[in-house]
Amino acid sequence: NDYLSKIPFRDALLKRLTDVANYEKIGTPFKKHGKYYFYKNDGLQNQSVLYVQDSLDGEPRVFLDPNKLSDDGTVALTGIYFSNNGKYTGYTIACSGSDWQEIYVMDTETGKLLDDHIEWAKFTGATWQGDGFYYSAYDAPVKGKEFSNVNENHKIYYHKMGTPQSQDKLVYQNQAYPKRFYTASVNEDETILFLYESGDGRGNALYMKDLRKPNAPFVAMATDMDYTYAPIEVIGDKIYMFTNYNAPKYRLMTADINKPALKDWTELVPESENVLSDAGVIGEKLFLTYDKDAANHAYVYGLDGKEIQEIKLPSLGSVGFSGDK
């Protein structure tokens, strides 16, 4: 600080940076359960505010203002998660730049903060299934060593709304590999629970559990952590997969729920000369984003893997998609 304070143009540089950052920023709207949400920053707010409106031309109102989560601005909003039934909105926060996360839940309709509160979560979101959600956490650390102890034995829990964290159900742990990380996701119809294992390679292992069968075990889909395996949706018995397995620039494959092992997967959209950077299922179509010449290019494919059209963008830039299957 002594050195920086002696820079003669420091104040001028700060003023210039402040001037160029001080403009209104509005994010792309997204639709959830009949309402429209978007992030907005008036210019110099530390964090963008999430707004909601009842229709595209409706009056926006504040849904969640992360700047009010603390008086000193040390609490950051790290994620927001809407339940599939529309009743709840979970959000994760981190304090003072820590990796530790806390999960809170609001009533989506009223905005009321509910009593449900999760502590000592880490590297996680809130993955909803019914009136509850899956999350990843460690055991509570020794008091006074919250930021110095080595974290081991990452676990996945299920929290049922209206109950204390102490009653949360342990869904998965693997004490044979205490330094690995475990996270969960659920498809839109809440029929399949996916388990991701990472920390021993550049990618992840992937397992699945059929939630329609209460006592079904986790079944291995792919275990080589040198590759990335990401399910993007489940339609019928078919799991659509985004992966770089034997395809450095990524491709789409499909797996059968009844025969989910990697050896039985089928290629759907082959690897291209351009990197496939994102994929999703929206309105029974595949929306694919490729990186070409330092810009995104968007395409629509059928669920059969055949290209339908390129989406012509107004200019070079980046693009993203969101929506229901």
Language model feature labels by segment:
Residues 1-2, 8-62, 68-325:
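Peripheral, non-catalytic segments that deliver or gate enzyme domains
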